[in-house]
Amino acid sequence: GLYITSSPGVLTGSDGYKMFLSNGTYNFYAVSDNFSTIPPTFTSGVSDPLFNGIDYLWWSAIQQDVNSSQINIPIVYGHVATQVVVELTGGEGITINQLVSAMITPPVVGATMDLGTGIITPATAFGKADKMGINGLTAQYIMLPIRHTAPMTLTLEISADNENSTRTYTTQVPLPDGELKAGNS
């Protein structure tokens, strides 16, 4: 079923959210996109195609004994996407006044998640450049996992040294051990 929580321990749902189970042993799974009220749809244990920019979360509780009228199972999500964080600092002879824009080349979209393991299959190709979120002199982007030997392209536009015009810098960001793994920054 589809359940929504706005505070710990309180679930609301559509189409009658109460879950009634016979006594037995069950495997429970939960997926969230930490973004909207509708997480990805799964068919035969595999998600619909996933997208960059979304903080996918996954949880499981395997072989849970249900043998009473009411049980509580705590859900502790883990991140299954990955994220890139770039923090700028001025060096010798330069003062950064503002990070104006940041673009990064994330993996192609369309990877899927396995419901039983929470694994998002890593992409093997880069997609189109996308805007990163900016907070002060820090840029951040959540993306699907990727495995590739080539680096990602990062383009930064900054205001520096109180100049009237901005400067644009492009650099190549290598993937640690050739991969941005799920749950890592």
Where are these regions (language model features)?
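Short, low-hydrophobicity acidic/polar segments
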Residues: G1-G93
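Short helix-loop boundary/capping segments
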Residues: S60-M152
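Short, aromatic- and glycine-rich surface loops/edge beta-strands on solvent-exposed regions
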Residues: T25-D33, A150-A160
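Edge beta-strands of extracellular beta-sandwich domains
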Residues: P39-S47, N164-P176
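A recurrent domain-boundary module in secreted/ectodomain proteins
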Residues: D177-S185
